[in-house]
């Protein structure tokens, strides 16, 4: 919503609608105010024609850009565009074989725990300095950062955080 109009335009639209700027993004409220102000600014009803034109321009621009952002295929992806690196089962997505994957990660294992641990080893070799949590999302960095033992509860917390982390941030 913040990218629909620039700051000056959004402030001007809110002023024309007679709404507080904190209401920006409340589309039903903005729509009601727009319809009310259309009656007030309409030249045939003795209103200000310039304000009416400007309000229409800004409102239509905002409305159009919001519709584009909310179309079903906006930013969508198709399965054909994404590789099948991970098995479909969510139980094996994060850790395929506990505790083997946590103690001896395999380069051939598709689970996130092994993939991130192997990436950790590679990046540590390139950088020659220690990696820390958020710089590296592997299970070992997570446990070290939070002082957790090697157990399934720590794995559960790690997998929950990894599940909420955007894939691009994992640097895989």
Curated annotation (Swiss-Prot):
Residues annotated as domain J: 12-75
Modified residues (N-acetylmethionine): 1
GO cellular component term of the entry, any: host cell cytoplasm
CDD domains, per database record: DnaJ (cd06257)
Protein keywords: Acetylation, Activator, Early protein, Host cytoplasm, Host nucleus, Host-virus interaction, Metal-binding, Oncogene, Phosphoprotein, Transcription, Transcription regulation, Zinc, Zinc-finger
UniProt zinc finger (H1C3-type) residues: 120-141
Zn finger (C4-type) location: 101-114
Cellular location(s): Host cytoplasm; Host nucleus
SMART domains per record: DnaJ
GO molecular function, a single term: zinc ion binding
Pfam families: Papo_T_antigen (PF02380)
InterPro entries per record: DnaJ_domain (IPR001623), J_dom_sf (IPR036869), Papo_T_antigen (IPR003354), Papo_T_antigensf (IPR036092)
Subcellular location, principal: host cell
Record's comment describing the protein's domains: The common region of ST and LT proteins comprises the J domain. This domain is essential for multiple viral activities, including virion assembly, viral DNA replication, transformation and transcriptional activation. This domain is also required for cyclin A-transactivating activity of ST.
Job of this protein: Promotes efficient viral genome replication by accelerating both G1 and S phase progression of the cell cycle. Inhibits host PP2A by binding to the A subunit, thereby displacing lower affinity regulatory B subunit. Inactivation of PP2A in turn results in the transactivation of cyclin A and cyclin D1 promoters. Late during the infection cycle, ST may induce dephosphorylation of host MTOR, leading to the inhibition of cap-dependent translation. May establish and maintain high levels of viral genomes during persistent infection in cell culture.
Subunit structure as annotated in this protein's UniProt entry: Interacts with host PPP2R1A; the interaction inhibits PP2A activity.
Name of the protein: Small t antigen
């Amino acid at each position: 919503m913040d990218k629909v109009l620039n700051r000056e335009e959004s402030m001007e639209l809110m002023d024309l609608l007679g709404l507080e700027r904190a209401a920006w993004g409340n589309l039903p409220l903005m729509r009601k105010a727009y319809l009310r102000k259309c009656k007030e600014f309409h030249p045939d009803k003795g209103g200000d024609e310039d304000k009416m034109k400007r309000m229409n321009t800004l409102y239509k621009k905002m409305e159009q850009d919001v519709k584009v952002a909310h179309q079903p295929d906006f930013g969508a992806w198709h399965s054909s565009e994404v590789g099948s690196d991970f098995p479909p089962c969510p139980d094996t997505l994060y850790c395929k074989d506990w505790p083997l994957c946590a103690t001896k990660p395999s380069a051939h294992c598709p689970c996130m725990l092994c993939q991130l641990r192997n990436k950790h080893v590679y990046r540590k070799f390139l950088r020659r300095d220690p990696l820390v949590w958020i710089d590296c999302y592997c299970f070992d960095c997570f446990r070290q950062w939070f002082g957790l033992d090697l157990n399934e509860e720590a794995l559960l917390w790690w997998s929950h955080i990894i599940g909420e982390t955007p894939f691009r941030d994992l640097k895989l």
